[in-house]
Amino acid sequence: VYKRQVLASAECVSSNGFQTKYAKSDENGFVTKDEFINQIDDETIVASLMWGNNETGVIQPIKDISKELKSINSSTLFHSDVVQGIISDNVDFHRNGIESAAISAHKIGGPKGVGAMFVNNKFKLPSFLHGGKQELERRAGTVDVPGIAAFATALQEQQTRFDEEVGLMNDERLIFEDKLKNALSVCLL
C-alpha cells in the first residue's frame, strides 16, 4: 500500500545489510494490527505505515498499531506518512504514537519540493546533507523560506476549509446515492 518511492527506500536499506519485512494488506489495502505487529521483533529499528492512502482512501489503525508495537519493542521508531490526514482533527502525533512523520506540501495545495518531517526528540537522526547547520544540522543548504511560508499558508487554508469540504462531500455523496438508488431501483445500506 506504500508508494514506489517508499518501497525503493526500503530496498536501499535492505541492500545495505538490514533485514526488511513487509506487512501484507487485504484486497482493500487495509493492514490489520496483527499482520503489522507480526513483523515486529526485538531487533526492529523502524516501522512505517501510511496513515491514509491517497488512492484507496483506506485509513490504517495507527493508534492501535503504535500502542501494540511499543509493547513489543519500545525502542522501535514508528514512522507514518501522514499527508493524507494532516488537515483532519485526528492528526495528533503524540496521542497516536507517531514518532516520525513525513508531510508533503503539494498534496495540500502547497508548492512542490517542500515538505516537513517530524521526529521525536528521543531519536537522533544523522545529517543526510553535510556542510551546514541548517535544519537542526540534518540538511545543509539554503532554507526555502518562501516555500515554507507557502506550505504553512496552504496548511492553514486547508484546516480552515476542512469542515466545509467534508460537509460538501457528504452532501454530494447523498445526492449520488439517491440518484443511483433511483436509477437502479435498489436499496443502499
Predicted regions and their residues:
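Pyridoxal 5′-phosphate
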Residues: 3-189
